[in-house]
Regions:
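NAD-dependent ADP-ribosyltransferases
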Residues: 1-143
């Protein structure tokens, strides 16, 4: 599966497959490596300052554990959540990666890049958020 339509930050929602009762709460103080997050190192329940989202409902539904949630970039930014777009992620993931996507293995960076392309992935960055539990409740609604 690949993303087909041009996603527009100003009008299109971002979707997240998650639990039925609530969106997982990120940990702003956790390791902020983007490759570590996307590659899902350390498995379920790992601490991460990011929440993965997708441009398409159907793609997010693949990761659903009961519900697909949605938000808008404007809502997230209003609550001090930073948005890292798919385009930005792809630009960071070349060679051994750049910035927060820098990683010792160029192969793992390349694999993370493939996942971003495949799932139309965007990241919501909670590193500057004081109370991520409340913030996730404010910015996400069931779609």
């Amino acid at each position: 599966m690949t993303v087909k339509n041009k996603w527009k930050m100003s009008k299109n929602p971002l979707f997240r497959g998650d639990r039925k009762d609530a969106v997982c709460v990120p940990s702003p103080e956790a390791d902020d490596s983007i490759v570590r997050h996307i590659m899902y190192f350390e498995g379920p329940g790992r601490k991460t300052p990011y929440l993965s989202t997708s441009e398409e409902y159907e793609l997010a539904d693949n990761f659903s554990n009961g519900a697909v949630w949605q938000t808008f970039v404007k809502m997230a930014k209003a609550e001090s959540v930073e948005h890292i777009s798919r385009t930005e992620l792809l630009a960071l993931m070349k060679g051994n990666g750049k910035g927060k996507a820098k990683w010792p293995s160029a192969f793992e960076v390349m694999q993370a890049r493939r996942y971003v392309e495949q799932w139309g992935e965007h990241l919501l960055d909670f590193r500057k958020v004081e109370d991520p539990a409340i913030t996730t409740q404010i910015i996400f609604s069931k779609s």
